[in-house]
C-alpha cells in the first residue's frame, strides 16, 4: 500500500536565471515499439540544460520582470527565461523539478507551495507530488488565535509530477491559469522576504529538463522545434492529426494520468520528424484483458472519420460473455489512408498479440487494404448495419424509392440460398430500373463480404446483425456526437467505460443467481443451458426453445452416408403480420453429433436455432452436443479461460509488463468470484490482505 501526505508550506522563490542561452540537443527516442522493420515512436525527447544561478545579486524589478501594465495591474513579461510548465517535461530529480517550478514562479510573479506528496509505504521513497500556487485553496478560519489577512483565492495553478521507470520526474498534469493578480503587486509584497541561497558546493546548478516534443500547448505544432513557424499552419495536412489548440496536450495529459493510476495502460503516438502528431493508439488494462477473452471476433468502427466527426476516432470492439459490446482499444487517425490504418493495425497486433478470426468493418478501401496486409488470414466482412443505414442517402432520390428499399430488404434478409439472392437482386435492379445505380453496382460486386447468404461459414458471435431490425451500435453512441470536441470526449470516455464495467460486473453477479423459476418450458435443452450460460445469453437461447413450438412437420428428406437432411417447417410472420410457412433444411450427423441449419444461426449468433433443436429432439437427443456449447457464453468463462491461459505460460523474469498482466488477471478472478455473495467477499478480502502482507514482508527484507 502507498500513502499520501499533505504538506502545507509556503516556499519562497529563491533563484534567478543567469544566462539567456538554452542549449538543446537530441536524445535518443524515449519509448519506441519495434514492429518488424518499423520503429513506432511514442515520444522523442530533448535535453535542455538551464543555467541556475544562486548567488548573483537580484536585478531590478523592471529588468527581471519586464514592464508594468497600468491598465491590468500586471507585469508584462518581456524577458521570459523559463518555458511555462508543460505535460511531458522530465527532470533528473524531484529537487530539479521543484527548483524549476520555483524559478518559473519567480519569473511570473507568484509563490509556490507543496500541496501533496506521495511516499512508498515501506521505503519512504517519494514517488509523486503536487506543487501549487501559494494562493491555492482557502485557510480554515476556526480556532485561530489571530486573524491574518486572507491571501488564498482558490487559485487552480499547479503541476502534478510522478517518478517514472527511468527514475526521472515527469510532469503529468499542468494548470497555468491563476485567478489573482501576478507580477508587480505580488512581487512587491514578497520581495523583502526573498533571499538568494548560496550553494557552498557550486555557484551554478544545472537543471536537466526532458521534454516530450510530441506535446504542445497549442495545436499540432512542436513548440521546441526551430521549424515552428514553418509548420504553424500545417494542421490541415492530411498527414497530420487535425487538432485544435490544446488538444495534443490534453491527449498526453490524459495518457499520463491514466498511467499514473494504472501502469498497464498502454498508448503509442506516431509523430513525424518535426514532432507533429499523426496517429494515436491506446488501450487500458481492462480492454487488454477483454481482448484476450473476446478478441476472436472484432468490429473496427471508422464511421467517426468517414462521417466527418469532430474527433477522428477509430474503435475496436468485441462481444463479451453476456453478448454485449466491450471495448478492446481506440485510436485517433490523421485520415482514411492505408498508411494510417496499417500503422494502427500493426500496433494492435503487437500489443494484443493475436490475429482476429473475423473482422467486421465499414466499407472502406484503405482499411480493407491494410487488413489484408496485417491480418491476411482473418475473415474480413462488411457491416450490414452500416450498409442498411446508407440506403436513404444512396437511394433516397429515386422516384420509386419505397419499392426499391422494400425489394432490397427482401433480397438481403429473406433469402436462404445463393440462387434465391441472385434472383431477388436481379428482379430488383431490372424491374425498378436501377441496374445503372453505381452504389448498388458496387454492393453487388462485393456481395460475398456483406450479404448473409454468402457468410454462413463465418463465425460472427452476434456482430453480423443478420436479422431485420438488428443494428450494430457504436460503443460511444450516447457519448459522442458530430460536434463533440476532443477534450470533452476524453472526459466522456472514462464515463462510458465506468458504466460498461459496472454493467458487466452486475451481469456477472446476476448470472450466478439464475434459478429454475425463470424456465419457461420443460425442454431439456433449456434446463441444460440455464446452468451453464450467462443470464443474457441464456435469455437469447431461451427464445429459440420457445419458438420450437412454431415449427412442425420435421421430415427426413435425404440420406447421404452418415449425413441425413431434414426439412423443418415454420410459421413465420410475413407481410402485413400474416403467418407464412417456410421450409428450413437441416443437416444432421448422429455419429459425430453435428447439426447444421440452412439459416446458420449458430455461426451468426453462437447458439443453435429452433430448427436444429427440433431435429435433435426428433432424433431423441436430450442434451445439446458439447461442440455447440461455446465456452465464451459460459458464466464461468473468465475463470476457465484464465486456467488455460494464465500462469501456465512462460513469463519473462525481466519484463514488468508481463508481471503486471499475470498479477492483474489473477486478482481479477478473485474480484469476480468474491462479488458473488457476502461469504465469498469476506474470504476474498482476507486472502487479498494476507497476500499484501506477504508482499510487504519481501519489501522489508530488501530494505
Swiss-Prot record:
GO molecular function: zinc ion binding
Highest taxon listed in the record's lineage: Eukaryota
Domain FAR1: 99-184
Occurrences of domain MULE (ranges): 297-392
InterPro entries referenced in this protein's UniProt entry, alphabetically: FAR1_DNA_bnd_dom, FHY3/FAR1, MULE_transposase_dom, Znf_PMZ, Znf_SWIM
Chief location of this protein within or outside the cell: nucleus
Induction data: Up-regulated in hypocotyls by far-red light treatment.
Tissues expressing this chain: Expressed in hypocotyls, rosette and cauline leaves, inflorescences stems, flowers and siliques.
Family: Belongs to the FHY3/FAR1 family.
Function comment: Putative transcription activator involved in regulating light control of development. May have a role in controlling flowering time.
Protein name in the entry: Protein FAR1-RELATED SEQUENCE 6
Source species: Arabidopsis thaliana
Gene: FRS6
Amino acid at each position: 500500500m502507498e500513502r499520501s501526505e499533505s504538506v502545507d508550506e509556503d516556499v519562497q522563490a529563491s533563484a534567478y536565471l543567469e544566462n539567456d542561452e538554452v542549449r538543446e540537443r537530441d536524445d535518443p527516442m524515449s519509448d519506441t515499439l519495434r514492429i518488424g522493420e518499423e520503429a513506432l515512436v511514442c515520444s522523442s525527447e530533448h535535453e535542455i540544460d538551464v543555467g541556475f544561478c544562486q548567488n548573483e545579486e537580484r536585478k531590478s524589478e523592471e529588468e527581471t520582470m519586464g514592464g508594468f501594465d497600468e491598465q491590468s495591474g500586471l507585469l508584462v513579461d518581456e524577458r521570459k527565461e523559463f518555458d511555462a510548465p508543460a505535460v511531458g517535461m522530465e527532470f533528473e530529480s524531484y529537487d530539479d523539478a521543484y527548483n524549476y517550478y520555483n524559478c518559473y514562479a519567480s519569473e511570473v510573479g507568484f509563490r509556490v507551495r507543496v500541496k501533496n506528496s506521495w511516499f512508498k509505504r515501506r521505503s519512504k521513497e517519494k514517488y509523486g507530488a503536487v506543487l501549487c500556487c501559494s494562493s491555492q485553496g482557502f485557510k480554515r478560519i476556526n480556532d485561530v488565535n489571530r486573524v491574518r489577512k486572507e491571501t488564498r483565492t482558490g487559485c487552480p495553478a499547479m503541476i502534478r509530477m510522478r517518478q517514472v521507470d527511468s527514475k526521472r520526474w515527469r510532469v503529468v498534469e499542468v494548470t497555468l491559469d491563476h485567478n489573482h493578480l501576478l507580477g508587480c503587486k505580488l512581487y512587491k509584497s514578497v520581495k523583502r522576504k526573498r533571499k538568494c541561497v548560496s550553494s557552498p558546493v557550486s555557484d551554478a546548478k544545472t537543471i536537466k529538463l526532458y521534454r516530450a516534443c510530441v506535446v504542445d500547448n497549442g495545436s499540432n505544432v512542436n513548440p521546441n522545434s526551430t521549424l515552428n513557424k514553418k509548420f504553424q499552419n500545417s494542421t490541415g495536412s492530411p498527414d497530420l492529426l487535425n487538432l485544435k489548440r490544446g488538444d495534443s496536450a490534453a491527449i498526453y495529459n490524459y495518457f499520463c494520468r491514466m498511467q499514473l493510476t494504472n501502469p498497464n495502460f498502454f498508448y503509442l503516438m506516431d509523430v513525424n520528424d518535426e514532432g507533429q502528431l499523426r496517429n494515436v493508439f491506446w488501450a487500458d488494462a481492462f480492454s487488454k484483458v477483454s481482448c484476450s477473452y473476446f478478441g476472436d471476433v472484432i468490429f473496427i468502427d471508422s464511421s467517426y472519420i468517414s462521417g466527418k466527426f469532430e474527433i477522428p476516432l477509430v474503435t475496436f470492439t468485441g462481444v463479451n460473455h453476456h453478448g454485449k459490446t466491450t471495448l478492446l482499444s481506440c485510436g485517433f487517425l490523421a485520415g482514411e489512408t492505408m498508411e494510417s490504418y496499417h500503422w494502427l493495425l500493426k500496433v494492435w497486433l503487437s500489443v494484443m498479440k493475436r490475429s482476429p478470426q473475423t473482422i467486421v468493418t465499414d466499407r472502406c478501401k484503405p482499411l480493407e487494404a491494410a487488413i489484408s496486409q496485417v491480418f491476411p488470414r482473418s475473415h474480413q466482412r462488411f457491416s450490414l448495419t452500416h450498409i442498411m443505414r446508407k440506403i436513404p442517402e444512396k437511394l433516397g432520390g429515386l422516384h420509386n424509392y419505397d419499392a426499391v428499399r422494400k425489394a432490397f430488404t427482401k433480397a438481403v434478409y429473406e433469402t436462404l440460398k445463393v440462387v434465391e439472392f441472385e434472383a431477388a437482386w436481379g428482379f430488383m435492379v431490372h424491374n425498378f430500373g436501377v441496374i445503372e445505380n453505381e452504389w448498388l453496382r458496387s454492393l453487388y460486386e462485393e456481395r460475398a463480404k456483406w450479404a448473409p447468404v454468402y457468410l454462413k461459414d463465418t463465425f460472427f458471435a452476434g456482430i453480423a446483425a443478420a436479422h431485420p431490425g438488428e443494428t450494430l451500435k457504436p460503443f460511444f453512441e450516447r457519448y459522442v456526437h458530430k460536434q463533440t470536441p476532443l477534450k470533452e470526449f476524453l472526459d466522456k470516455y472514462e464515463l462510458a467505460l465506468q458504466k460498461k464495467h459496472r454493467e458487466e460486473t452486475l451481469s456477472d453477479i446476476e448470472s450466478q443467481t439464475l434459478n429454475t423459476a425463470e424456465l419457461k418450458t420443460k425442454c431439456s435443452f433449456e434446463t441444460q443451458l440455464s446452468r451453464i450460460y450467462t443470464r443474457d445469453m441464456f435469455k437469447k437461447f431461451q427464445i429459440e426453445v420457445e419458438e420450437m413450438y412454431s415449427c412442425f412437420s420435421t421430415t427426413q428428406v435425404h440420406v447421404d452416408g452418415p449425413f441425413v437432411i431434414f426439412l423443418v417447417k415454420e410459421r413465420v410472420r410475413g407481410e402485413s403480420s400474416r403467418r407464412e410457412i417456410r421450409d428450413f433444411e437441416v443437416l444432421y450427423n448422429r455419429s459425430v453429433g453435428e447439426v447444421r441449419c440452412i439459416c446458420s444461426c449458430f455461426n451468426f449468433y453462437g447458439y443453435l436455432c429452433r430448427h436444429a433443436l427440433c431435429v435433435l429432439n426428433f432424433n431423441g437427443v436430450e442434451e445439446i452436443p458439447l461442440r455447440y456449447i461455446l465456452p465464451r457464453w459460459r458464466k464461468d468463462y473468465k475463470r476457465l479461460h484464465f486456467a488455460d491461459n494464465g500462469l501456465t505460460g512462460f513469463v519473462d523474469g525481466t519484463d514488468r509488463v508481463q508481471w503486471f498482466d499475470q498479477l492483474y488477471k489473477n486478482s481479477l478472478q478473485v474480484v469476480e468470484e468474491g462479488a458473488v455473495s457476502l461469504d465469498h467477499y469476506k474470504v476474498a478480502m482476507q486472502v487479498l490482505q494476507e497476500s499484501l502482507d506477504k508482499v510487504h514482508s519481501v519489501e522489508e527484507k530488501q530494505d
